[in-house]
């Protein structure tokens, strides 16, 4: 039976490149001259933003979003933490979400069942496997999931015929 997987993943290499480009942009921007502002990537999952003031951290957020979009990374995978401010400066943690959570996977399955497509969906850890008898049914399922607006970016891979 034909099948495919629905995943929500971020290419770690592109993420590293985007963070490096954002740091280079901080070095060249006039409003960040002489300021200790930087992005740090930890374990490919968390981006730390630090600057002397919370206003500059907000500007850095815009820079980071622009660089991620330029590298083809959907910004819906980012989860911004609370702003931490003290006398030394301001910091914010940005978590990069990987995988589909159980609750979101159930929403995807419910959406497929609601459309009454002739496909079956199984939740396998942090991904969703969709199987059907015909390839056309799977293509309809892909079109439905692309059209539906979920708060996370979806990729479709491992298409087996």
Swiss-Prot record:
Residue ranges the record marks as coiled coil: none
InterPro entries, A to Z: DUF520 (IPR007551), UPF0234-like_C (IPR035571), UPF0234_N (IPR035570), YajQ-like_sf (IPR036183)
Xref: CDD domains: YajQ_like
Cellular component, GO annotation: cytosol
A Pfam family that the UniProt record links to this protein: DUF520
Disulfide partners: none
Keyword line: Nucleotide-binding
Keyword Nucleotide-binding part of the UniProt annotation: yes
Recorded GO MF terms: nucleotide binding
NCBIfam families named in the record: PRK05412.1
Annotated family: Belongs to the YajQ family.
Function: Nucleotide-binding protein.
Name of protein: Nucleotide-binding protein XOO0711
Organismal lineage: Bacteria, Pseudomonadati, Pseudomonadota, Gammaproteobacteria, Lysobacterales
């Amino acid at each position: 039976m034909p099948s495919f997987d629905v995943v929500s993943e971020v290419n770690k290499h592109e993420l590293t490149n985007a963070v490096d480009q954002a740091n280079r942009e901080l070095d060249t921007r006039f409003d960040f001259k002489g300021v200790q502002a930087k992005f740090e990537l930890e374990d490919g999952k968390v981006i730390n933003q630090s600057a002397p003031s919370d206003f500059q951290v907000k500007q850095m957020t815009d820079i980071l979003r622009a660089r991620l979009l330029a590298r083809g990374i959907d910004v819906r995978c980012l989860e911004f933490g609370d702003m931490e401010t003290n006398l030394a400066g301001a910091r914010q943690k940005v978590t990069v979400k990987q995988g589909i959570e159980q609750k979101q996977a159930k929403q995807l399955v419910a959406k497929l069942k609601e459309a009454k497509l002739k496909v079956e969906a199984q939740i396998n850890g942090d991904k969703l496997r969709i199987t059907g008898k015909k390839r056309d049914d799977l293509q309809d399922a892909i079109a439905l999931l692309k059209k539906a607006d979920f708060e996370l970016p979806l990729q479709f891979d491992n298409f087996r015929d």
